[in-house]
């Protein structure tokens, strides 16, 4: 299973959506929504970038989440996306302190 396929399935389950509901909410045709989402989750087909963007909106995750290889990186992307602008600045400052000159 590809990283993209795995992340789509994880985010869908986390959101509590069926494959059909996710496909419909992302703008797929009613007759093929479930089948297409199933194929994406199995890694048999790769969704176009514009569909990945729509999935990210429906599932409330950043599009980059779908391409994160490591699970902790994927989780970090979700958490970072939920921060406000000021919180992001604070986090980046703290990360710079922690990393120093690494």
Each model region followed by its residue ranges:
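A short, Lys/Arg-rich alpha-helix, primarily the initiator
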Residues: 1-14
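Short alpha-helical DNA-recognition segment
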Residues: 16-39, 54
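DNA major-groove recognition helix of helix-turn-helix
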Residues: 26, 41, 51, 67-70
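DNA major-groove recognition helix of helix-turn-helix/homeodomain DNA-binding modules
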Residues: 44, 48-65
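Interfacial/linker helices and their anchor residues that mediate assembly or domain coupling
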Residues: 70-102
């Amino acid at each position: 299973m590809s990283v993209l396929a795995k992340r789509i399935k994880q985010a869908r389950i986390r959101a509590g959506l069926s494959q059909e509901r996710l496909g419909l909410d992302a703008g797929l045709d009613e007759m093929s929504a479930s089948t297409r989402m199933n194929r994406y989750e199995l890694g048999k087909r790769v969704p176009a970038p514009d569909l990945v963007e729509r999935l990210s909106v429906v599932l409330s995750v950043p599009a980059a989440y779908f391409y994160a290889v490591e699970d902790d990186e994927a989780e970090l992307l979700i958490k970072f996306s939920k921060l406000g602008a000021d919180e992001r600045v604070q986090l980046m400052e703290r990360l710079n302190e922690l990393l120093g000159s690494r």
